[in-house]
């Protein structure tokens, strides 16, 4: 990208985040608060993902008004600035907004009193570093950039799977030790496993595709990638031979890469 083009992009971003979005939200929030209005901000996907789906279905049964807004944050160009503008206006009078990924729009202004901002995150646990935990690495953003356009300052609640994860999320989000918005109340996407019919179907599908797994213990190896997305690599340090020698024939190893 040329220096001039990058300068234009940077200037446009500053104008929108520091001027246009705060003003738009201020005007939008003059409208009466609709406590039963809920917005699901799907940051990257073009469909409702599993971290949202169960919450969405439950909310519908409670007489609330759930709406889904697809941000498509992973598309190139500067179109996201206009999509952010529309979302900013929509959030001006909502009772609750949920998001499932990093989105720096949520740090561009202070939400009105009465609006809850809930981060459900898109993955379970904390199996890799992100956010402010990787500012010293080649594929991480600089701390200066993260602080200039903060993404996590407005959360009322961030749901995580266990107490052991809390410190990792607080570090990645740049939270002070006294910030208690990260709570281990569970992750909605794992509700799937608490329905017996889903477990039965999962085992049936497993045995269909891997007959040798029947009547055996199953070990799943599911490594995530590290590095820049376009140069990502998967760790290949798993010693399958050693596993076989130590676990014996009563185990089956399944490999599912990110």
Which role fits each region the language model picked out?
Residues 20, 68-69, 96, 165, ...:
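Intrinsically disordered, low-complexity N-terminal regions enriched in serine/proline/glycine
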Residues 13-23, 125-134, 164-169, 203-209:
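Phosphate-binding glycine-rich loops and adjacent basic patches that engage nucleotide phosphates
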Residues 37-197:
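Active-site and donor-binding regions of nucleotide-sugar-utilizing enzymes
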Residues 30-39, 114, 214-217, 250:
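A short, charged/proline- and glycine-enriched loop
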Residues 1-39, 43-44:
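Membrane-proximal basic amphipathic "stem/tether" segments
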Residues 23-34, 149, 207-213, 245:
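Short boundary motifs at domain starts and secondary-structure transition points
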Residues 1-5, 9, 13-16, 48, ...:
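Intrinsic-disorder-associated interaction segments
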Residues 47-55, 188-258:
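Conserved catalytic-core segment of nucleotide-activated headgroup transferases in glycan assembly
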């Amino acid at each position: 990208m040329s220096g001039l083009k990058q300068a234009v992009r940077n200037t446009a971003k500053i104008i929108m985040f520091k001027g246009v979005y705060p003003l738009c939200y201020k005007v939008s929030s003059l409208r009466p608060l609709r406590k039963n209005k809920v917005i699901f901000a799907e940051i990257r996907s073009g469909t409702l993902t599993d971290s949202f789906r169960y919450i969405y279905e439950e909310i519908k049964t409670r007489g609330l008004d759930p709406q889904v807004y697809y941000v498509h944050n992973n598309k190139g160009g500067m179109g996201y600035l206009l999509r952010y503008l529309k979302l900013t206006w929509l959030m001006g009078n909502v009772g609750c907004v949920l998001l499932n990924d990093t989105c720096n729009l949520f740090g561009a202004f202070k939400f009105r009193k009465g609006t809850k901002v809930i981060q459900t995150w898109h993955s379970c646990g904390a199996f890799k570093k992100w956010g402010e935990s990787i500012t010293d690495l080649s594929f991480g953003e600089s701390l200066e950039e993260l602080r200039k356009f903060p993404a996590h300052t407005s959360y009322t609640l961030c749901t995580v799977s266990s107490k052991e994860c809390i410190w990792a999320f607080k570090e990645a989000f740049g939270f002070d030790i006294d910030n208690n918005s990260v709570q281990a109340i569970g992750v909605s996407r794992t509700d799937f496993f608490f329905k017996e019919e889903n477990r039965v179907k999962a085992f049936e599908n497993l045995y269909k595709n891997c007959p040798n797994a029947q009547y055996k213990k199953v070990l799943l190896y599911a490594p995530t990638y590290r590095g820049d997305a376009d140069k990502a690599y998967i760790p290949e340090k798993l010693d399958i031979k050693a596993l076989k020698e130590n676990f014996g024939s009563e185990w089956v190893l399944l490999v599912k890469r990110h």
